[in-house]
């Protein structure tokens, strides 16, 4: 393990300009130095990240570098700015926020990332995939590690000052290979860093720069042995064969990439109506509860995915139908793209359970309801005696009834359906009444729903 400086605490004694010259003095930059011109220099990315771990010598030319890491060992990532300080005036803020992630390099595993990480969580309860070593880190503020995102950490830092984050990766590459029999090749990961600046509201949401590199993680000291093995293999090759491979660099430069597609989707919902006076009560019409009939096997909801749905509409549909974990996976899919996918495609991408559920949701295969009932919201000014309504002497503005299809004969399911129908919170509904033959109101309970279903059948 080679570092440029033995004491990270001394970084603040040097300015960022001299530190950047150290980075540009690496062999990888020396090869490109003759080609640099003022125009090319202006196109340099605003930031640069350097992982202080040696690259493998067994990587062919024109292939991406590969870096071996030891499980649980702290590795330094240096956060650098490439431009002059004057170029950072457009940031309108002193700090930027960086998010470091460890993700899969294999596209096949990217499709099932959620299931893979959940399986790892169950096999390693209480552990994290990625941690930040705060005591060793320099120049970072407000480091955070979400308990729900085991493979990501985030923090703030000042591009005008020296900053280094020390990370620890706790999962090894062979934990995600098919069933292990010994001697398998571990799957490669990626270390990706996404940096954001503040928007006009002070939120770190405006993307500034992203870069990543390929890694493999071994058990403690395994990375050192693998690096030595690769070096010995290269020494046995002829000079002509060695020309086909990259030299091993003491540090790993993260290369620019697209930002990680982590998008927060907000579902538009109708505003909750304001109510005055007594708590809300909803009436179930007299004799308007009926068992399921073939003619009444209507769709449970009208929220079907249409071929004309845009990419944004498809993302919101996934979110509304409890497929939020696949929003990033289908980030570029329109409604037509999703509708064209077969059951086998979705099972392979999402796993058996979620794949079948997503296929049924896309194709509009709904569960046949156990009961169909009709409800109305009876407003205070429209409440008149039942006899007056029958005689025609009451208010002509009668309640409008809506059909509700119940998959479960429980009060909770009924309240949730009513709340969804009227675009209010279920907590706003205190009781639900069923209006009897003589106009009496009976509080609806689970027992009453079950008995009504039995007697109606």
Curated annotation (Swiss-Prot):
Example GO molecular function term?
DNA-binding transcription activator activity, RNA polymerase II-specific
**Where in the cell?**
Nucleus
Record region (Disordered): 219-245, 271-301
CDD domains referenced in this protein's UniProt entry, alphabetically: SAM_LBP9 (cd09590)
Domain of life from the UniProt record: Eukaryota
Pfam families, per database record: CP2 (PF04516), GRHL1_C (PF25416), SAM_3 (PF18016)
UniProt GO cellular component terms: nucleus
Family matches, as PANTHER family: TRANSCRIPTION FACTOR CP2, TRANSCRIPTION FACTOR CP2-LIKE PROTEIN 1
Its family? Answer: Belongs to the grh/CP2 family. CP2 subfamily.
| Protein task | Transcription factor that facilitates establishment and maintenance of pluripotency in embryonic stem cells (ESCs). With KLF2, acts as the major effector of self-renewal that mediates induction of pluripotency downstream of LIF/STAT3 and Wnt/beta-catenin signaling. Required for normal duct development in the salivary gland and kidney. Coordinates the development of the kidney collecting ducts intercalated (IC) and principal (PC) cells, which regulate acid-base and salt-water homeostasis, respectively.
Name used for this protein in its record: Transcription factor CP2-like protein 1
Q: What is the lineage of its organism?
A: Eukaryota, Metazoa, Chordata, Craniata, Vertebrata
